């Protein structure tokens, strides 16, 4: 009788668990976590669960709600390309397709839990499939923009010891040119209708892959994603995030900054290589059960952008300030955005005048937010709060955001200092885990009881934060983080360049752009400066990701330096911004 009872109990648990989810080893009844549970965790009212997997605990739960009619008839992913091609997946379809993708990664590609996978794909549906497949299998997902050059890819593959790369045909030639220098890379997976010698075909393998796959029981703090983030010196650092830091940590962002519900359709303009894609196009959106809309445009243009907003029932728009600066130059009153109700921006400071022009022309407010690759959303203008033009808004839970001095002391309102997040007595779960293989850089982010962002700001008496500038020399242009070292390294490869210093320079559309101060070698000093500028710009575009090239170049006799010979970038930067 006892055996029969135990069998019936086990059968009940098996039938009620989420699809593709293994039972806990102790066969305890599985209780699904809800959006309210995730919010309670972010508000520190509930402990972090021991185990968590975004695919099983979030995506598969929305799939269940679709079956029971608890979620509106709204796609999970809606992709278009402006050429008549369209993809619409429900959460159920996303689940079955991502299980097929998981089998592709683990069987023909031979990847196992904890292996690192580099993914360099444009805004195509396969990017989302591979992302979710990695979550299901415990494979560490490492996204990169398709603008990466062969040199950039080589660094990332060698630094991460990636065992496999998933790439599109735009990137495959660059990978091929450096693959022999990557001894850890075992498999190349091509997402393309074309076949390449030495590459496995994702489409062919996916077509015959099984939909049966059991999701790995991942720990909440288990590594899930690595982002390469630029700094002022050296090459990009590998910021590692866990299943919960991204998968649970963006709950409040989704509910109160993005203001999403399961009936919403969000269009987030971020490139797939950046953490902003994780915020707006994966975790925040799908935590709330919303639809992620994607328009793959060959090249951004305002007319196509505005036509998309008028044609599709997009309710929520998230774009960098650069896009809004371009849009407000159009006569927006001619357009009818019938469904659009909530607009957001972030990645760089937004000019107050642009915010006002957008509001006057569309009747919609712009809600600015501020965050970082390492820690996600830090502060934001949230729905229901007063918007102070030019402010980044108030601090977001679970963070205690403060302004501190060089000794780690909290400064009073109105005093400029570094924007910092309190780490003690308890480190917030949504922090990045570490910079992989770089304990010195990881330790350098801590000052006393705080994590320092590297940004300077001011908090007013109402708790609103105002961005002043970078504490270091990182340039943020059109939302891209650009380290001066990478641009200077590219420039020095050209025979005309003796040395250079790269800083930010004000720009009406992009906020700030890369400017290079260049000391020329003697044989090149008589060259036509305009032609030489174009030559150097073209050289940088070929040597590193094209978005990093210096849009401004000034030839100088010498660079300002300290007594020890270090270039004083701050002098050049101040010179650029002084008259603004």
Curated annotation (Swiss-Prot):
An example Gene Ontology biological process: fatty acid biosynthetic process
Function noted in UniProt: Catalyzes the activation of fatty acids by CoA to produce an acyl-CoA, the first step in fatty acid metabolism. Capable of activating medium-chain fatty acids with a preference for C6-12 fatty acids.
Main localization, broad class: mitochondrion
Reaction(s) the record says it catalyses: a medium-chain fatty acid + ATP + CoA = a medium-chain fatty acyl-CoA + AMP + diphosphate; hexanoate + ATP + CoA = hexanoyl-CoA + AMP + diphosphate; octanoate + ATP + CoA = octanoyl-CoA + AMP + diphosphate; decanoate + ATP + CoA = decanoyl-CoA + AMP + diphosphate
Any one GO MF annotation of this record: ATP binding
GO annotation, cellular component aspect: mitochondrial matrix; mitochondrion
InterPro entries in alphabetical order: AMP-bd_C, AMP-bd_C_sf, AMP-binding_CS, AMP-dep_synth/lig_dom, ANL_N_sf, Mitochondrial_ACSM
Organism of derivation: Homo sapiens
Signal peptide: none
Binding site for ATP: 229-237, 368-373, 455, 470, 566
Transit peptide, residues from-to: 1-22
Protein name per UniProt: Acyl-coenzyme A synthetase ACSM4, mitochondrial
Compartment annotation: Mitochondrion
Family: Belongs to the ATP-dependent AMP-binding enzyme family.
